[in-house]
């Protein structure tokens, strides 16, 4: 596989707490140029990125970075991100629940978020 073909599988990502709009613009321009799968950006930039780069798949994270937010908070983040133009959601799994063996609760959280995103992409990270 050529590197150009590989790009279509890459989520070009900038998730630092200090990421600026200028950095998001650069990221989006690179993703467009290289035809990457998506850009994964902080939710605070989703609406603006979607307005400036409507041709891109915009991904954002919920429950980031620790995953230990409650399910309702993750659902609220998801709803807002979708309303702002996100086409993909990366959900941070609650590793504490996994370590505790709370698999039914983890499964239910994933199910609820998938229900919320519908036919859009949900990735559990």
Language-model regions: role of each:
Residues 24, 74, 78, 106, ...:
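Aromatic/hydrophobic pocket-lining residues that form the small-molecule binding cavity
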Residues 11, 49, 81, 124:
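Conserved, mostly hydrophobic/aromatic
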Residues 7-9, 38, 57-59, 88-92, ...:
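Structural preference for beta-strand elements that scaffold enzyme active sites
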Residues 34, 84, 116-117:
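Structural motif
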Residues 43-66, 101-123:
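Alpha-helix-loop-beta-strand connector modules within alpha/beta enzyme cores
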Residues 16-20, 25-62, 69:
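Conserved alpha/beta-domain cores
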Residues 6-21, 59-75, 96-102, 125:
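Active-site mouth loops of central-metabolism enzymes
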